[in-house]
Each structure stands twice: as structure tokens, then as C-alpha cells.
Amino acid sequence: MSQRLLLITALLLTAFISCEKDPSTFSNYDQITQTSIEGNYKIDFNTSIITGKVKIYFKAQMDGEVIILDTNELTILSVIDSNTGYDLEWKLDTKHSLDSLGTPLKIYKEYTTNETVPILINYQTSPTGAGIQWLKPEMTSGKIHPYMFTQCAFIYCRMLLPCQDTPSAKVIVSTSITVPKPLVALNSGIYKSSIENANTTTYFYYQRLPIPTYLIAIAVGNLEGRKISERTTVYAEPEEVDKAALEFADTDKFIQIAEAYTYGYEWGEYNILLLPPSFPYGGMENPCLTFVTPSLIAGDKSLVNTIAHEISHSWAGNLVTMSTWTDFWLNEGFAMLLQRKIETELYGTEVAKLSSQIGYFTLTEQILNFGESHDYTSLHPYLVGVNFDDAFSDIPYEKGYNFLYHIEQLINNEAKEDLFKIIIRAYFTEFKYKTITYIAFRTFIEEQLIKYFGETKALNITTAINWKNWVFDPGFPEIKNDFSNSLSDECDLYLTKLMNGDSMNGFDLVFKEWHEYQREYFLSTVIADPRSSMLKDEQYKVFSEVLSLGKGWNVNISGAFFNIMLLNKKVDEESLMMLESFLATNGRMKFIRPLYLALAKINKRKAMEILNKNRNFYHPITLRLIEADLSKIIN
């Protein structure tokens, strides 16, 4: 049987995938598709409401008589046919509402194939919508002015504006934001101009490249900028902006390395906004304005790998976008790949392999937490009726990266050169500005294999890839990549000494001299070791006293220490005070969700007490997920 026939057979077996409709949207984007959005937003801090007016242009894919959009907690005021100026009939279809997805907005308007249909919608947001956080002045660094920011990923743009809230329907976006003086509005586009009125300022932005709605972003606060390169300005509150500019000074180096691996950066500007500590993630790759957590400010640039990751999304995710959240790994696996190419260039192969080892630790932990047979451990999970937040984990990042690394090794070992780099550059060229499914990615790779190797060798490689196991099967992949390196070997020696009860004299100096990834790897291996929950006093003191990990270290190390503390049920008054302080000042879910869960397994009442104290501090997404975690604990 020829290679082409085998490929055709494989494609037929999985062809249904390419026809899958995004299960995370109510919209009929496959019948009539949004192409651009003109948004006008008036920010009211007194009511915590945005009054919005959006003009959405649609392209009809077929004849029809209804446009269906996503909404969640929006009050629709009017829907107007922009061509005629007449009101259109509409309804919020509450009969089909889902807590996880919101309420479909049905607009009754006839259209014909290829027709351009402009619709104007006036509406208001809700003060309680999870896609927007409103911060009172006391929750900011300056303590004088309020602050707000959006988080539209994963399916929360429908809380900011009515739209086809799916990655499958990318849009050109123009934005105006009216805010009270002296506040500044930032957006995921290029700044164009501003108009000052008596008590307000209106800011105008334009995003010329098509983006999915989850990348639409707005932030308003008392903000200042520091230009650190020709294309990067760092924004933050005045009290934080200089520290942030110093921490992220190497940003353009990261961009240049990513450009060398792919092609030129297309977004014009790469700006960074340092958000308040309630921001729930390490970073969010909003185009032209990456959002980052203040927990990255370590003072020594040791945590800027997050910036490298968000920069990588400028190609992986933002230019070439997964069609649905089911293929999230196509965004995050490629972003991890580019991040580790940046790390290889900056720090060397050994550090990049160590980074990959840490990633595999994370992958292992999260697969075991879900259970090896759980659908969410697959790279193609079933998401019908699911809020993607509930399925979210690092599995698409690290399993996706490991899959791509596996493909890279197969291709380059056969080619005896870095052919994979050439193929990936072609991938980012072929699919830029578009959305992509797993099947389109697979087809592209298999076509490239035939192009460079011919049918026989291509068949051997594509068979060795084992697509089904990597993409569809839950749990661990059958192939485990080799990331062995000398840096982790040194860490392993100290882990053995610690667990054997040997002397750790001088380890504090060694630990301080290690690369940040070595420290993270060592602590990860300690936590993963079954003996770590039964440390003797002298062993535990290595962390609590010799290294003093609960004080003065960056958030990665402090978070790991508190995990070790709770594993050993060290819940004396002093330990709990340190933990409570950490939880009250950090809103990043990566760190605080596991700590609340670990504390609840020891003392659920105490965990709930701390959570209730911080209820007004945490982002709504964070609060919902922690409450869901704790609801599963009975003690």
C-alpha cells in the first residue's frame, strides 16, 4: 500500500475532527462569521459596569435568517441593523443557557451567501462577571485610584461584549475606551490617539491583525510606562514601574531569538503590563500588551522565563491559532517549544533540558491528580458543556511540548540536520492569521515528510510518531523523551543525601549558587518523593532554617516550601502565619490552589477561614476554582 493511500486512510479515520464545531460557543459562526469588531467602552468605577457599544461585521457563509452570539451576564439594550438604522428583533435565549457557557443572543436578520452584515449592539456588563476584575484603591499599590482589567481567556470575552466567542472566528479590532481622569486605558492593540474631555479621557486603539476574542484585553488604572527598547514599553503603577522595567530589560533579546527561529515579529509593539497581585496567571499573551503577575519581580531576573513563553505566543497561538479549545495544545505545546528554544540560546542546552525535566515533573503530577484514564489528560479532551477553566491544566503545555519534541527528534535524526526548524518556520508561515485543527497540523507534517524524505521514509517516520497515542489516548504517552543533563544530576545527589539523612553542611551556599531551574528541580523532586511527607526534624530544618525558604525567596521557591511544610503537617502558629501571609498577597493560581487544597486536607475549616478573609482580593476565576477544589474535601 502506498504512503499516500495510508495517509488518506488515516485521514478518513479521523476526518470527523476537522468538522467538529467548537463546543464552547453557542454561536453559529460556521453559518455567518464575524470579521471585525468596533468596540466603544465607557468604564464606570462607581457601579463596576462597562457601558458598551459594539459594531460587528459578519460575512455570511450561507443563506440564513438568524445570527447567534455568545453572552454571559450582559444586559442587552438594543440591536440595530447598521445598514438601515432600524432596530432588529432579538432575544436572550435563556431556555438554552448553561452556567458554564452563558446565554445565547439570537438576532433575527436575513442574509445571503457572501453578504457583509454589520450589526450594532448597545449593552452593559455585570458587576459580577468573572471576565472583569474591579479593584478598589486599597487593593492597588498606590492606594488612591481604582483599577480594572479584563481576562477574556478562556471563554470570558462574552462577559465583556456579545460576540462569537470562539477561536475559530478571528477578528480585526478597533477600540475606544473612555475612563475618568487621571486614569490611563491600555488595550491589546496599537495606541492611536486620545481625546480629553472635562472629566474623562477617551483612548483609541487598533489591532490590524486578526485575533481570537479571548485575546481582547482592557486595563484601566493609574499607570505609567517605561520604554525599554524600540518596540517594548513596560507599564505599571508608578510605585512598581521602575522595578518592572529593570526586571524585564532583556525582553527584546527574547524576541530576537524567537524571530531567528521563526520569522520577523509581526505585531509592531510588544508591551508588558504588570498587574496587581490578584492576577490569576503568570502571564497572558494579549497581543501588543502581555499581562503579567507581579510575582515575576524577583529582583534578579530569575523568573523571566514567563516573558519568553508569552513572547512565543506571538507566533504560537496569536498568529497561528487553535480552532477550538479542544486543540489547546497546538497553542501551548508550540509556545513551550519556542520558549525552550529561547532558553537554549540564552542559557545553553543543559538548562533547556532541565527546564524540560521540570515540565515533565509537572506533567506527571497533573496526570496523576486527574487519574491516568481521565479524559482531561488527553490532548483532545471532550469539552461539550464544559467551562474550559475546569479542564485547564499544564498537560496541554507539557504533553504537547513532549509530543513536538518527539517529532523533532524523529525528523532531525533521519535528516542529520535541523530540518524540524525549517518545517516549523513553514508551519508558522502557512497558517499565520488562520486557525488550525489537529488534523490540519497532522496533514501538514505528513506532507512535509513526503516532501523532504519521499514516501517510504515518510511512512516510517509517521508510523513512529504514533499520533493516536499522543493526541487521543489519556494518561502518559508511550514514549518518554530523554532530557538527562548534568545540572539535574547534581540536584539528584543532594536529594539522595537529604533522604538518607546525610550531612547537608554547606548546602545553603550550593543552593544559592544554583540556577533557578536547579532550585526548582530540586524542590520538585523533594515534593514528588514519597518520603517527603515523613521528613525527620533535621531533614525538615534544611528547608525551614538552613535555607529559610519561607522568607525572602521568590514565589516559586516559597510556594514549594509551603507545599513541603503542609506535606509534613507543620501547622504550628508561626508556620500558619507565614502561609496565611503568602496566600493573602499572591493571587496566582499556580501556587495558591495547591496550597489551599493541601491545607484543607489537614484542616478544611482553617482553609475556608483564610479563603473567606481573602475573598475580595482574589480574582473571580480564582475564587470559583478554589471553592470547587475545597468542595471535594471532606474532613
Model regions and ranges:
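N-terminal, polar/Ser/Thr-rich
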Residues: 19-51, 77, 141-147, 167
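Amphipathic alpha-helical substructures
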Residues: 393-481, 541, 564
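Hydrophobic helix-coil surface modules that form long, contiguous segments used
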Residues: 52, 151-155, 163-308, 337
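Zinc-dependent metallopeptidase catalytic helix centered on the HExxH motif
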Residues: 249, 293-359
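A surface-exposed beta-strand-loop module
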Residues: 73-140
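Long, His/Glu/Asp-enriched segments that create or flank divalent metal/ion-associated functional microenvironments
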Residues: 402, 469-551, 556-558
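Acidic/His/Gly-enriched intrinsically disordered linker/tail segments
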Residues: 332-402, 461-474
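Surface-exposed beta-strand/loop patches in extracellular or lumenal glycoproteins
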Residues: 55-74, 165, 173-180
